Amino acid sequence: METVAAIKTLIQQLAQSTDQFGRAEINDALRELQYSLETPFDTVMRMSLDTCQVAVARIGSDLGLFKHLSQCASPQSAEELADHLGCGRELMSRLLRYMASVRMVQQTDDIKYISSNITQTLAVPGLEAGMRHAFENLWPVLMALPDFLAERKYPDIVDAKDTAFQKAFNTDQDCFHWLATQPTRIANFKVLLTDERTPNFLSTFPLEKELGSWSAEPEKALFVDIGGGMGHACIRLREKYPNQPGRVILQDLPPVLQAAQATLPLSGIESMPHNFHTPQPVQGAKFYFLRLILRDFPDHQALEILQNIVPAMDAESRIVIDDGVPPEKGARWAETGTDICIMSALGSKERTQRQWEELAAKAGLQLQALYQYTWPVVNAAMVFSLQ
């Protein structure tokens, strides 16, 4: 199989010589090739057994395997790992054998184990929390989705209190209110929110251009981060533009702001308790910023959030929506998969540019600019003004 080895080497060389967009294209091509070469049996086995990955990853996370193995200086045997982590030796051997088959770990020629890129990924707290959140909070919802839809004769899901989430967890509350009563389930979600991803909207957002002739008076707000969580956007803005005048305000619920105080700088960023389901108190700010907020709500609730901001705007104000913008055609699996998940749990959706513009128009807003900052999965800062 020298030809296969040569092709593999060529692909690795191509991946090393290109950017993230090129690597994504290579991944897509390889995935499409894999699917096209599968036998019917291969296809069914893949669909049936892919579910093992998150379950086994969760077990590895519970054991602390990924953190431990990523710190080991030499290959470890299954017995050594089992004894160190408090696991049955045969169980550890079987777990590692599966993990090696999907590259969660790497198996050496002498049947020992070292970390892989996936091991390193699952050792990062924010990314590990994302996997655990998916297992604990999303998997049960997706398992309930087929029966939920069949029982209702396959309607559109547009109500946050009438989704597969309620069926999965036997509750009449929406996802966020129910999770707030479940400290063990929401813990990983909170850690996930602290993960600071790069690149971010400031990678391509032309602040000076968007400021135009706007001039900051002492009490005038430059940037209001609505539902801004731990304040990452505010911090990044102040770090990149330390001399830019104007107030930078982080808004969220009081418990969130209390948690954020540990990471916020001592000066330059104000904390303001605010629920975005109520009218916006800061008048005439230049930028009202919403990052990954509206995707969590069905259209009617997302519209209400925008309508709570519009009365506070003046002619120079802009609402900046930082969110996913999947294409109408050729959306990638990560975008379409996210869409199915948030539909099932929240009654919401990933919106195309057309859908964002239609939603904003109902609130009296119009799109002025769109600045994409991730490829090929599209995340972008969309700038809206009053009509």
From Swiss-Prot:
Q: Where is this region: Substrate binding?
A: 175-195
Keyword GTP-binding among record annotations = no
Effect of inactivating the gene? Resulted in about a 5-fold reduction in leporin C accumulation while leporin B is not detected.
- Report the SS bond pairs: none
Q: Write out the GO MF terms.
A: O-methyltransferase activity; protein dimerization activity
Q: Which PROSITE patterns match?
A: SAM_OMT_II
Which annotated residues bind substrate?
Answer: 135-148
Q: What class of enzyme is it?
A: transferase
Which positions does UniProt annotate for S-adenosyl-L-methionine binding? 227-228, 252, 275-276, 291
Listed A to Z, the keywords are: Methyltransferase, S-adenosyl-L-methionine, Transferase
EC number(s) for this protein? 2.1.1.-
Entry's Gene3D superfamilies? Vaccinia Virus protein VP39, Winged helix-like DNA-binding domain superfamily/Winged helix DNA-binding domain
Q: Does the keyword tRNA-binding apply?
A: no
Q: What GO biological process, any one, is recorded here?
A: methylation
Tell me where the transmembrane regions lie.
none
What is the stated purpose of this protein?
A: O-methyltransferase; part of the gene cluster 23 that mediates the biosynthesis of a family of 2-pyridones known as leporins. The hybrid PKS-NRPS synthetase lepA and the enoyl reductase lepG are responsible for fusion of phenylalanine with a hexaketide and subsequent release of the stable tetramic acid precursor, pre-leporin C. Because lepA lacks a designated enoylreductase (ER) domain, the required activity is provided the enoyl reductase lepG. It is possible that the dehydrogenase lepF also participates in production of pre-leporin C.
What is stated as this protein's family in its record?
Belongs to the class I-like SAM-binding methyltransferase superfamily. Cation-independent O-methyltransferase family.
By what name is this protein known? Answer: O-methyltransferase lepI
